[in-house]
Amino acid sequence: MSERKATRASGGYGLLLKDSAIYGAGRMLQKFLSALLLPLYTYFLSPADYGVLGMVLVTTALIDVVVTLGFDVAFSRFYFDDKTEEGRNRVITNVFWIDTVYPAVVLGLLAVFMPQISNVLMKGPGYALYFQLALLNEFFTNWSDLPFTLFRLEHKPWKFSAFMFARIAIQIPLTVLLVVSFHMGVMGVLIGNAVTSFTLNAASLPTYWRRLAFKVDVDLMKKMLAFAIPAVFTALVFFILKLSDRYFLMRYWGKTQVGLYTTAFTLSEPVYMAMTAFRMAWPQWHYAKLDDPQRHKRMVSRSSTYFMLLCVAMMTVTGVFMPLLIRLLTSRQSFWSVGPTTLVLTFSTVLYSLYFVFWVGANVAKKNRQIPLITAVASALNVGLNLAFIPRYGMIAAAWSTVAGFAVLAALMYRISQRHYRIAFEWARLVKMGVASGLTILAAWTVAQATGESVRAPFGDVMLHELYKAPVALLFPLLLYALGFLTPGERERLARAARRLRRRPAMPAAAAAGAATLGDAATFDNPPRPGARRREDAAAEAGGAETERLAAEAGGAETERLAAEIEEDEFEDAAARDHDGETV
């Protein structure tokens, strides 16, 4: 097997898809089931109560930046420096001490002074215990970052997702019990979070406990700190960009406005969930191809287009069916005004995803020292806009300020990355998907206005109006096709998929043909597996003696891997043709 094929076998599209799907499934199910708690929160908590919860969680996120010390990044960076088990165990041990002793000191001091701190944040007394419970949850959550990061570094997505499912199984019922049965309100939510984090942390200890040396490697610790601490400043200015608007809303509008904005933020999270799943698997996937820069650039460009298409499609669906989304996930009428803010925040997350895509070039060229500067510029713009417009316009101004900040951040990141590692991103296709999304959302709004749709109407009327708008959602793929979004290679693969679907009704004939080609692998009593059918089609279309040999070996795992290589070859060839100018 060639070196190229060996590399592909260890880190090809199959690995990216598998890891993204598994990480994403765990995260998305967790977020989905957590979203199911939103009707509970909006029924048992007032907007003001939800605002208190939002302020507690945002403040905890700020504290997390200081407590983490950037060691999540350092862990990933130094773990691969020494490929021996002993060397990696030293890294794990250092991370363990940073995740336990240092946070215990910092969080303990904050807990002592929290009555005074919370009095300033909330403009009144009586909130200290809420924040102290959140600090306890932060301690165990930060500690559990060690095993969860280790699962990802060692490509154990199933184990990672098992803990995500366990979080759901514990946190959801416990929160429902405390909020509904014991009427504990915000306190019940925070207790449920803390108990869940403690339980998961305790359960994860056996997965790495034997690898701890309990002796700090001082020299290694100095290097890790030198690498990690600069990231703290970046994280702080990034916090300002993403979350500081809550403090402005609290200052000028109060807890109720913070609660509504927090609701809108929760409703806008589907795109963020997709980005989180993708960013967990994407870096280790494309960095494995750096030995061939031209190939690496093509693969990054094409895969980022598909990722952005997913994000834009999710934003489009959110915009089209916003009234239904609000009515399904919020209970009280006092929460139903968050639609416009939700859509704007979803757009800001799409821009955040674009920033993440553009970051590749700076990472490859090791030019990340400029990231704190450009993040500070974007954050300064965000703060300035918040100061100028939040006092008058409230949460919609906060949302648009976030959009402006992320737009500037993405633009600056693109400029830095392209200067040092030029990637031919598919700008024409990105613009086309943006135009298609905008026109689709505009059409949905026009239909809503024409039919008199109102989010405050009886639920049956809302459902009826959403049915009127359902065909509008089809505009998005139709516009993509009309605008020439698809490349020739993609149209060819779609046509091939359509041919396969048309052949499926004739299953006996297909099975017989498979039996003739594959021998005992396909009979009426033992029909071909879906993977075998893919291999047969790949062999027929790829051509050549080597491919026919692969099809003949279709029974085992080796063939599955080789067939995946053929599939990836087709993808790479299509990407290369497109980048060579066959399409725009």
Where are these regions (language model features)?
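Interfacial segments at transmembrane-helix termini and the short loops linking adjacent helices
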Residues: 114-134, 255, 319-350, 456-460
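Interhelical loop/hinge segments that connect adjacent transmembrane helices in multipass membrane
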Residues: 1-16, 186-187, 202-242, 281, ...
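Transmembrane helical elements of multi-pass membrane transporters/channels
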Residues: 19-34, 167, 189-204, 208, ...
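Specific pore-lining/lateral-gate transmembrane helices of multi-pass inner-membrane transport
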Residues: 80-97, 260-376, 497
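Signature of the first transmembrane helix
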Residues: 3, 11-73, 103-114, 172, ...
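C-terminal transmembrane helix end/exit motif
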Residues: 2-3, 72-75, 149-153, 157, ...
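Membrane-proximal transmembrane or re-entrant/amphipathic helices at the cytosolic face
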Residues: 2-6, 446-541, 547, 559, ...
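Hydrophobic alpha-helical transmembrane segments
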Residues: 128, 132, 161-209, 227, ...
